[in-house]
């Protein structure tokens, strides 16, 4: 579907714990795995070490990057009238919308789906405490570092394909050259 995009963001923390949370990187890909937009973002404040250890984005990486007030408008434009899928959409989408509001960027109209909710239901592990399916971590299916926004987008795409029964990205014996 050309109107469906996959989004992932990496941040300075959790909005519920820190109202000044900023995005430090984001990626947006289409359903063919092609990059629509991917960028580091200068949060205008130091990235806490505990968070740097999770996603690997350091202050020196973002010092020359554009701030959200500039690049957020480009992302919002790309998301307009699209179906945006995110793994843990409640976190990623909420933060994008929050930062658009904070910086006076018009909030785009778009449809949202949470790949984590679908995957949790697919796995089927029930949480009596929540009265719902237990949230599952995003499996690292793409090459690269987990918690890199582009790698996480690619892993989300591969996960969606696998859940739908599409194993076309799986290597087959035809892909292996045994002439050595």
How should these model regions be labeled?
Residues 5-7:
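Residue-level marker for buried hydrophobic side chains located in beta-strands
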């Amino acid at each position: 579907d050309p109107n469906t995009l996959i989004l992932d963001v990496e941040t300075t923390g959790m909005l519920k714990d820190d109202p000044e949370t900023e995005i430090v990187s984001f990626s947006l890909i289409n359903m063919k795995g092609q990059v629509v937009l991917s960028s580091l973002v200068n949060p205008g404040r130091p990235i806490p070490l505990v968070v740097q250890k999770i996603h690997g984005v350091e202050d020196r990486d973002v010092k020359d990057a554009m701030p959200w007030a500039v690049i957020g408008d480009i992302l919002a434009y790309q998301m307009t009238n699209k179906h945006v899928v995110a793994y843990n959409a409640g976190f990623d989408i909420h933060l994008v919308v929050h930062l658009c509001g904070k910086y006076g960027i018009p909030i785009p109209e778009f449809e949202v789906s949470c790949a984590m909710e679908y995957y949790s239901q697919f796995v089927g592990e029930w949480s009596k405490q929540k009265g719902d399916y237990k949230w599952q971590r995003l499996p690292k299916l793409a090459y690269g570092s987990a918690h890199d926004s582009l790698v996480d987008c690619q892993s989300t795409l591969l996960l969606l394909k696998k859940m739908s029964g599409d194993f076309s990205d799986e290597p087959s014996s035809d892909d292996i050259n045994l002439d050595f």
